[in-house]
């Protein structure tokens, strides 16, 4: 009888210890955004262009993404092609899509040298450009006030060596256009998180130092800047357009921590990790490790609030048209099949081990 009772007790104890393990497995998120939110972060997002082919929109409507960024529809050439004459149709479409599908909207971008109408580039008077810049920021942010959780206020203001990129705003207004832009934006929508956004910050070199100086400059004016966006247009291997593959977890983490040390958040804002095409099984494994490094670096720094992918499927990626002979940069292939990088990315977000080299 004693043996029977002991056996029963041991069996019950064994069952009791098995329950938490089972529950832990059940709690593992099965979608990217759910995994990110479960880690106490803000979102996994994607860029969006509304197309007649609904494949991407239908996938975005699901649970994989919690945030969307207008790929082109909120840029200056799309919203104010002629001075004082605003066009909202494309941006409204995306804002409505976000609202209807319960997505955050990370809005992009207000002051940028590219996709800028020629009439802006032709301005050579300080007062005129100040008026134009102020009105543009106020009108665009005002229309989407309360709908944009984050704004890329200034985009790509730096050269690779960390100096200021030549553009009409720098030539006519001077470096103060940076804090002035943030001051106007903060007044236009006080609730929105305001970011400086750029590419090639991830390597921790001179350009990253330039971004740190921009944060300090804006802060020195007593103006709000909430974060730095690292675009994350990276490569798996040396390509014709980029010689340095995606950095190590340690390098990426240090870069993000540098921003946190200045009291601002960070986010990966336009991630795609391209390779020399065509892709192979081995190249896809290398890509999976690179995506894992990006995700892990964000998990390592509490002030990294989110990761946005620059597209869903390779089918519509901007990469092949921009970088000849390169592509296969996203988590879904041309046929919307998940690539190995999807699983490694999800595993890291779920706190699981993933190969990172």
Model-derived segments and spans:
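Short, acidic/polar
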Residues: 48-64, 131-140, 206-218, 252, ...
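Substrate-binding cleft and catalytic face of glycoside hydrolase catalytic domains
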Residues: 33, 63-81, 89-201, 264, ...
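Boundary/entry segment of secreted carbohydrate-active catalytic domains
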Residues: 24-73
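Fungal secretory targeting signals
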Residues: 1-27
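Structural recognition of alpha->loop->beta junctions
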Residues: 61-67, 126-129, 139-149, 215-227, ...
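Aromatic-rich peripheral "rim/lid" segments of glycoside hydrolase catalytic domains that contact
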Residues: 26-34, 80, 118-123, 139, ...
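Glycoside hydrolase catalytic-domain groove-lining segments
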Residues: 87-89, 93-104, 172-194, 204-279, ...
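Acidic-and-aromatic substrate-binding clefts and catalytic sites of carbohydrate-active enzymes
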Residues: 46-58, 76-89, 158-163, 201-210, ...
């Amino acid at each position: 009888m004693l043996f029977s009772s002991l056996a029963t007790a041991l069996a019950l104890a064994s069952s009791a210890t098995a329950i938490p393990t089972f529950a832990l497995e059940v709690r593992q998120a099965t979608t990217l955004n759910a995994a990110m939110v479960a880690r106490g972060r803000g979102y996994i997002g994607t860029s969006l262009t509304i197309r007649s082919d609904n494949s991407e929109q239908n996938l975005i409507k699901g649970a994989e993404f919690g945030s969307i960024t207008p790929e082109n529809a909120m840029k200056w050439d799309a919203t104010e092609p002629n001075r004082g004459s605003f066009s909202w149709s494309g941006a409204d479409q995306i804002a409505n899509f976000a609202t209807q599908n319960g997505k955050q909207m990370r809005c992009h971008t207000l002051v940028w040298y590219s996709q800028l109408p020629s009439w802006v580039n032709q301005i050579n008077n300080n007062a005129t450009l100040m008026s134009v810049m102020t009105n543009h920021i106020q009108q665009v942010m005002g229309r989407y006030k309360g709908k944009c959780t984050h704004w890329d206020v200034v985009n790509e203001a730096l050269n690779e060596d960390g100096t200021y990129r030549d553009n009409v705003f720098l030539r006519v207004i001077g470096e103060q256009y940076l804090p002035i832009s943030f001051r106007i934006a903060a007044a236009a929508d006080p609730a929105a998180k305001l970011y400086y956004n750029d590419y090639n910050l991830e390597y921790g070199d001179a350009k990253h130092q330039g971004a740190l100086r921009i944060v300090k400059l804006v802060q020195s004016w007593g103006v709000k800047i909430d974060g730095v966006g690292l675009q994350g247009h990276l490569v798996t291997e040396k390509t014709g357009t980029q010689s340095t593959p995606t950095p190590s977890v340690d390098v990426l983490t240090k870069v993000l921590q540098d921003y946190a040390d200045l009291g601002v958040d960070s986010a990966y804002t336009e991630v795609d990790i391209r390779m020399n095409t065509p892709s192979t099984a081995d190249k896809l494994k290398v890509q999976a490790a690179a995506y894992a490094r990006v995700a892990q670096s964000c998990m390592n720094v509490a002030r990294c609030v989110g990761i946005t992918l620059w597209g869903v499927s390779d089918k519509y990626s901007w990469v092949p048209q921009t970088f000849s002979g390169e592509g296969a940069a996203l988590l879904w292939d041309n046929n919307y099949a998940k690539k190995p990088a999807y699983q490694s990315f999800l595993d890291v977000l779920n706190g699981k081990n993933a190969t990172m080299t």
